[in-house]
């Protein structure tokens, strides 16, 4: 009999619960389609860098409170161990208004005199008409080295960024009369990038939103479980597929158990054979119903805390999980045996937060380190921009992205089209991250570097060594270390040593 640690056992219990949730779907994904969803298309494996865009009516108040989530803290918020009263996400502004003790609720009362959230719609749409230029966005994303773009087409507030033919039964005309999804898709693809759509599948606050209990419980219980909502999500997702053929289908907060997920997956892959999906498709509405049972929320929190106590458990795969795994303001402690995508904002929020300053943003070196570390661990980075209500990407967000683009222009071959090596880092000396192709091993040395520097030897035979962006004048190997002399010191923030195999 095999014995498991408490954390590993908890992980297996979570997998079992996930499979139960999947079985609860009225139309579960077939084994064949599930396997197809886990086969990553080569373009996605090679792309490494994507741009996420959160933009909508919440960009008008542009208010959220709190510092960025730390690794693992999102789960702590969900499992009730965080002291936070509200997420630092602008796109959750409407949810924060539900609780009078939040900073967002106080701000809304002071600035907007508690006006209904729907009042932001005409303001947002007028601003978009005045200021948005999708071609300029696409030019900028291409210049920073992005290979794909994922637009939030509907967030939890239910507002759609395209003129949907599927009527919201609870809120008339709750969507853009302008086809912003189509305009951006055309602009992005015209510049050779792929285009994907995010759609809030599990939550839509125009259908239901609770605020009378434990906040974790409220989020779970707010996932609509009705047949009406399942049909609505299916119809809008199918409409997105028909209109835009998204290369990425990005779900969030689960998928309604009555939403015909199996049929949707089969339809998507038939229409977009080279497409891919993420992993957030569990039947969260079933979880919400369980959360309504006395004591059930406590048990789920306890199970989650147990699982989170061991980082190694996160590296284990879940056979019921579709698509690539997502990590939000988080990472892994090693190289997972599955493809994954790290996503976060440049600051604490995904949507534009007018309170944030340049000091709240990732610096260019931090963003480069984030990308390099993720790619070395078999991941892609989907870095978010939050435009203001006029569609302008703030300068403080542009700055780190431009720095990343400059670095990628020199060192992109160590990122694009690479795969993880047998290990992601070195064991001694300077911090290094490894990537590889059939012809080369890349050692990406993190941090500023002098004209002469020393790193640990990878311990493999090679034909020759280069340093990208510089001329290598001299190389000495001694006691498992390599010392290299460049013609000029590179400014950093990371340099790439290429071992030609």
Task: Name each model-derived stretch.
Residues 1-2, 351:
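Accessible peptide chain termini
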Residues 26-501:
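Mature catalytic domains of secreted/periplasmic carbohydrate-active enzymes
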Residues 2-14:
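Bacterial N-terminal signal peptides that target proteins for export
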Residues 22-24:
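C-terminal motif of bacterial Sec signal peptides marking the signal peptidase cleavage site
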